[in-house]
Design a protein with these regions (language model features):
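Acyl-donor (CoA/ACP) binding surface of acyl/acetyltransferases
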Residues: 1-30, 63-192
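Conserved GNAT-fold acetyl-CoA-binding loop/helix
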Residues: 30-52
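A generic secondary-structure signal
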Residues: 52-53, 124
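Short loop/turn motifs at secondary-structure junctions and domain boundaries
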Residues: 54-59
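A short, aromatic/hydrophobic, helix- or strand-capping loop or linear motif
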Residues: 34-39, 60-66
């Protein structure tokens, strides 16, 4: 799994020294409200996550830690589907899809960190993952996440997908959006 970087953002493998900041981030009310992380979020959750994800794609999903100024500042991952799972091989055009998901720690919000991380992962999915389309889903009402995907070039679907995601045992509605390679905005338009 390659490191990816732009501006102040570094995407890298998770490390055990991320655990304390991961716990802080996942105990944040906004993170809990808009994601499916367990509540309460304990150090064991973070340790298990890090141990499962260090450096290797899992079931087609590649996950990175978001780092800013040497500090863990969130998670981002892309789930490659179909032919796109053959990372490193030339996947046939038109067969690759991916879903992207992320959260940004409270201390990194409002600085464009999530937008840059999202751009890096989408660019990687198109160039290296064999993807022709990247899809995003977020719980209806998660306006900051919606703004991020719009800045990167995603097109929001008109109607929410009804009860598409399970969050802590309840089915909830989500916004959905898709990004094609030609829709990805130039990186320099996002840099500080």
């Amino acid at each position: 799994m390659p490191d990816l970087s732009a501006g102040p953002v570094l995407l890298r493998s998770h490390r055990l020294d991320d655990v304390d900041d991961m716990v802080l981030a996942c105990r944040d009310e906004q993170t809990w409200t808009w994601t499916t992380v367990p509540k309460p979020y304990e150090p064991e959750h973070a340790e298990s996550y890090v141990n499962r994800t260090v450096g290797t794609p899992i079931d087609g999903e590649t996950r990175w830690a978001i780092e800013v100024d040497g500090r863990f500042s969130g998670n981002i991952g892309v789930m490659l589907e179909g032919e796109a799972r053959r990372v490193g091989e030339a996947a046939p055009v038109g067969l690759g899809r991916a879903d992207v998901g992320y959260f940004v720690a409270p201390w990194a919000r409002g600085r464009g960190v999530g937008t840059l991380a999202l751009w890096l992962v989408c660019d990687w999915a198109f160039r290296k993952g064999g993807c022709e389309v990247v899809t995003w889903n977020a719980l209806v009402g998660n306006v900051p996440s919606r703004r991020m995907v719009e800045k990167v070039g995603f097109h929001i679907h008109a109607d929410p997908a009804r009860r598409m995601v399970v969050q802590r045992g309840e089915r909830v509605d989500v916004w959905t959006a898709d990004l094609l390679p030609e829709d990805l905005v130039p990186l320099d338009t996002l840099l500080p």
